[in-house]
Amino acid sequence: MNLTFDTIAAQATPNGRGGIGIVRVSGTLTTRVAKELLGKVPIQRKAEYLTFYHQNGNIIDKGIALFFPGPNSFTGEDILELHGHGGPVVLDLLLQRIITLPGVRIARPGEFSERAFLNEKIDLAQAEAIADLIDANSAQAARAAISSLQGVFSTTINDLVEKLTSLRVDIEAKINFPEENETNVSIDKKIIANLDQAILSINKIRTAAYQGCILREGIKIVITGKPNVGKSSIINALAGHEVAIVTNIAGTTRDILREYIYLDGIPVSIIDTAGLCNVSHNEVEKIGIQRAWNEIKQADHILLVVDSSTTKLSEQDKLCNTLIANFPYKTPVTIIRNKADITGEKIGETLNNNYSVITISALSSLGIEILLKYLTKIISLPSSTEGVFLARRRHLEALEITANYLLQCKEKISFPTMLELIAEDLQLAHNALSQITGKFSSHELLKKIFSRFCLGK
């Protein structure tokens, strides 16, 4: 894809003072920028120590210049990198000098990576991996981002796309050449086998992508329950400091409170919510309850808190089942029996009606270590991150759409009259997968993704 752009420039190192600061230039006018600032075009792919000149002939700085001619560069265009001293004034003088040249402007956030994508140097998943590597919160996440950048995720997706294409070819052949009855039986077996294989593949990819998404974005745990059961005390205990105001007055928490902790290197967002009461005549409290339900709908895991001092074990099932009936069907729930310091109940983990029940006293910090170990266990990833790639929520959504279309194909495969519908479902599955790598993506999606990158990337 040969595209014509303005020449762009940006600081590629963070703002502030440092030993080295880098300014990056990319585009058709890069060699002109080099001649104006350096008096020459640097030797290709070799570091040269040169002087950086102002247009009036004064010296701005001295440093290393690197020139990477396109198309064999990161963006696919000519690239110039100037490595000078990392003072903000020096770097600003360099940038201002560069953009005085006609046809050169400051780059938008992520525009270098966007050009690499548009010039087919990387795909969209690899472009996102660049931002993910920069933002990695742990060594595990960094290693997974490198895997994505090297194309592990993309290769997995492209392999499945090829399987779907092959499957669609077989379906189209059956539609277009119905008179070839001799091969119909063998084609049927081949189609069913290939479809089953594709379904197995998408399920395996979804599992790996979910793990990659947890590494990147963490997991969202929502603390909920009736008013005054100790939800705020629990978030304070898990955080290790006071996040929420704790009183004996029911309904103290009216809004959403968030706290971030790390468990085994995985970021965990813990959310305290307003108490879920049946009827409220307070408008502010009503809004808080609605926000609580919104958070519950988006949770990866729900901690349902019960006040053990007012709810006997025999009453717990009825109370919890009433609330759980309104929770998202697939979201796992753990029941927390709080205030054991009042009741004297045994601290620890038990199992009741297939739900894990953890008895604690948040106010006295009794059982908090048990709860933390339990949370670490339920969100833990495989000890080996070999082959693990980072994924985003949009990737999970695309994979879910693909899986649903393939399951629809499976339901229709026994009916010869539905072959055209199967072919259409396969095409839609193909399109959903291709959104991950950017082979089939809207302009608005691309704009949204690259706008979140930092300058100089």
Swiss-Prot record:
Residues binding Mg(2+) are 232, 253
Which residue ranges does the record assign to the TrmE-type G domain?
218-380
Keyword Nucleotide-binding attached: yes
Q: Which residues bind K(+)?
A: 228, 247, 249, 252
- One cellular component term from this protein's GO annotations in UniProt: cytosol
Q: How is the cofactor bound?
A: Binds 1 potassium ion per subunit.
EC number(s) reported in the record: 3.6.-.-
Q: Which SUPFAM superfamilies match?
A: P-loop containing nucleoside triphosphate hydrolases (SSF52540)
Q: Name one GO molecular function term.
A: GTPase activity
Alphabetically ordered keywords of this record = Cytoplasm, GTP-binding, Hydrolase, Magnesium, Metal-binding, Nucleotide-binding, Potassium, tRNA processing
Main location, first listed in the record: cytoplasm
Record-stated family:
Belongs to the TRAFAC class TrmE-Era-EngA-EngB-Septin-like GTPase superfamily. TrmE GTPase family.
Descriptive protein name: tRNA modification GTPase MnmE
The protein's organism comes out as: Baumannia cicadellinicola subsp. Homalodisca coagulata
Gene from which the chain derives:
mnmE
